[in-house]
């Protein structure tokens, strides 16, 4: 590899390419003379579109192929949506940079209704997320929730074709693709607690690649990294992937981290919630202790069912 060239492994969806170009532009602005190339590739999660993600199973559905490219030195960094990044990494790889977070909330998108509460009973709502599903079902058990797969454009087309009365997407993705006008309402965390890392872009690389790590240092956003550290520590203890009914959201308020989390039965019949407040330097321990509380309060049994009997210890 030439000293002034850096290769980015990325998925090929419009949103993934936006994220890769975002990182490319930041790197080139921070390091004039650096040449940044994109290496687009297809992941397993991109190929299996006819099955709900929760049924596909496994962790890292959208990252594994990118990690192989790093290990085989076909790329220097991989750019991910943080909510897709597993809690464990292949040996030799790691998450080294988390960029500044965009709006982490979920978006209510509909052509005919202004809000979730305005939907008539029996309305069909689309989402691919068990996390969104359990919170929707708890608040509105009278709605019909159906699986919704594909990239953002595909999902919006299915809404526009009349297959759904409303769909739930991430505010960040819609804003990044210039589709903010499609958002009827941003759902506050009290109604739809976001996914771990939602709205943040993470960068993975080979841990022994000091040159690349030095180039990436300028892109790390300290506050976002603290918040996502707390969220991911909780998720790690719960052994959660991105396809389980787990929500976690940390805010930094008055110098203190406020971490909220939930684990829910997919049908919304039971949701275990908890929260912690503490010093930023204790972010990781806060996440772990909150996960322990959730497990002891019933989350262990919920996750055992979702994981087909294989519950966190």
UniProtKB/Swiss-Prot annotation:
Instruction: Recite the UniProt keywords alphabetically.
Output: Porphyrin biosynthesis, Transferase
Q: How is the cofactor bound?
A: Binds 1 dipyrromethane group covalently.
- Report the domain of life of the source organism: Bacteria
Show the GO MF annotations: hydroxymethylbilane synthase activity
What CDD domains does UniProt report for this protein, alphabetically?
PBP2_EcHMBS_like
* Cofactor(s) it depends on: dipyrromethane
Which reactions is this enzyme annotated as catalysing? 4 porphobilinogen + H2O = hydroxymethylbilane + 4 NH4(+)
Instruction: Please name the SUPFAM superfamilies in this protein's record.
Output: Periplasmic binding protein-like II, Porphobilinogen deaminase (hydroxymethylbilane synthase), C-terminal domain
GO CC list: cytoplasm
One Pfam family in the UniProt entry: Porphobil_deamC
| EC numbers for this chain | 2.5.1.61
What InterPro entries does the annotation carry?
Answer: HemC (IPR000860), Porphobilin_deaminase_cofac_BS (IPR022419), Porphobilin_deaminase_N (IPR022417), Porphobilinogen_deaminase_C (IPR022418), Porphobilinogen_deaminase_C_sf (IPR036803)
Record bears the keyword Transferase: yes
**GO annotation terms (biological process):** protoporphyrinogen IX biosynthetic process
Q: Which residues carry this modification: S-(dipyrrolylmethanemethyl)cysteine?
A: 242
Annotated pathway: Porphyrin-containing compound metabolism; protoporphyrin-IX biosynthesis; coproporphyrinogen-III from 5-aminolevulinate: step 2/4
Q: Which family does it belong to?
A: Belongs to the HMBS family.
Its UniProt miscellaneous note says: The porphobilinogen subunits are added to the dipyrromethane group.
Q: What does this protein do?
A: Tetrapolymerization of the monopyrrole PBG into the hydroxymethylbilane pre-uroporphyrinogen in several discrete steps.
Assembly notes: Monomer.
This chain belongs to which protein, by name?
Porphobilinogen deaminase
Q: What is the scientific name of the source organism?
A: Escherichia coli (strain 55989 / EAEC)
């Amino acid at each position: 590899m030439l000293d002034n060239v850096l290769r980015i492994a990325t998925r090929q969806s419009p949103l993934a390419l936006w994220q890769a170009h975002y990182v490319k532009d930041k790197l080139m602005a921070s390091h004039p003379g650096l040449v940044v190339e994109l290496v687009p590739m297809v992941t397993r999660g991109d190929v299996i579109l006819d099955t709900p993600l929760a049924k596909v199973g496994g962790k890292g559905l959208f990252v594994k192929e990118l990690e192989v490219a790093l290990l085989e030195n076909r790329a220097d960094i991989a750019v991910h949506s943080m909510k897709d990044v597993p809690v464990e990494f292949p040996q030799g790889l790691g998450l080294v940079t988390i960029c500044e977070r965009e709006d982490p909330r979920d978006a209510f998108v509909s052509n005919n209704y202004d809000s979730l509460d305005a939907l008539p009973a029996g309305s069909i709502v689309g989402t691919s997320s068990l996390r969104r599903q359990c919170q929707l079902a708890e608040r509105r058990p009278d709605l019909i929730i159906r699986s919704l797969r594909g990239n953002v454009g595909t999902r919006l087309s299915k809404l526009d074709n009349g297959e759904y009365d409303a769909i739930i997407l991430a505010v960040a993705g819609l804003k990044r693709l210039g589709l903010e006008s499609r958002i009827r309402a941003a759902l506050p965390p009290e109604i739809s607690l976001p996914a771990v890392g939602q709205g943040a872009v993470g960068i993975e690389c080979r841990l022994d690649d000091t040159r690349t790590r030095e180039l990436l240092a300028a892109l790390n956003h300290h506050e976002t990294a603290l918040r996502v550290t707390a969220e991911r520590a909780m998720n790690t203890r719960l052994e959660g992937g991105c396809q389980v009914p787990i929500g976690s959201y940390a805010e930094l308020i008055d110098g203190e981290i406020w971490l909220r989390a939930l684990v829910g039965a997919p049908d919304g019949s039971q949701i275990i919630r908890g929260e912690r407040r503490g010093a930023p330097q204790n972010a990781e321990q806060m996440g772990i202790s909150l996960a322990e509380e959730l497990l002891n309060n019933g989350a262990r049994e919920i996750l055992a069912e979702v994981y087909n009997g294989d519950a966190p210890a």
